[in-house]
Swiss-Prot record:
Repressor of the treBC operon. It is able to bind trehalose-6-phosphate and trehalose. SMART domains: HTH_LACI. One of its GO terms (biological process) is negative regulation of DNA-templated transcription. This is HTH-type transcriptional regulator TreR. The lineage of its organism: Bacteria, Pseudomonadati, Pseudomonadota, Gammaproteobacteria, Enterobacterales.
Amino acid sequence: MQNRLTIKDIARLSGVGKSTVSRVLNNESGVSQLTRERVEAVMNQHGFSPSRSARAMRGQSDKVVAIIVTRLDSLSENLAVQTMLPAFYEQGYDPIMMESQFSPQLVAEHLGVLKRRNIDGVVLFGFTGITEEMLAHWQSSLVLLARDAKGFASVCYDDEGAIKILMQRLYDQGHRNISYLGVPHSDVTTGKRRHEAYLAFCKAHKLHPVAALPGLAMKQGYENVAKVITPETTALLCATDTLALGASKYLQEQRIDTLQLASVGNTPLMKFLHPEIVTVDPGYAEAGRQAACQLIAQVTGRSEPQQIIIPATLS
């Protein structure tokens, strides 16, 4: 059986010093791109990751997990992270934060760095474009949040249920001309599932659907709300709080105050600025807690990967 390679071995095979290998492992500056690529190629060729004892000697915690968010400024993801952190701290784990910016390539790079650092596990906020092959190494030590993948642990929101709750509330209030502002179907959860839930409710209750799917940004809500407002429209359902905030700004500027807004999110900013908007809480805080607890249970051998659905509740 082949002996495990050490940092000294990687340095020798790469033709560099041990300190250079250490800087590459920790993704630190001070290493040329050419040298970094040469060291990484050697590590990948030999499947190298530092031992826990080596990490401890470098002053690193023996219990480290990573949280990869899509955007550091995401209101919903921050609500989930706020409940993850105490759960990890309580069990002695040091969390590190990374950002994917909805880039599968960045996720792959982050996972490569984390693999080389031999961390304990990862919570990954999922999005369209992440493949199961990309995650293969992490099957027993990763939890996906807001997306699911076969064979992997996941914590997902009930997207269809959230829309159904809001549509039912608006319908019960007497609204029969309910428009929809959402996200393209390339986003499977926030986009496709929520829009299809809106269409299904309209079909079941014989309502005429009027929808636009511009994207996630507040500005897109602002710029596209006029496309879904007809003279008959009495209510507007937005797939996210950010879209609702953009739509609300447009309606205020146009002095339209008879339209009932509804949205999925219930973030603190929305509740403070627009308490009149009907919202559902998808369970961001609970999802964060569940994701942290599931990951800890997996890496300590107390649980196999499980798929968890967080129910939405009317705020």
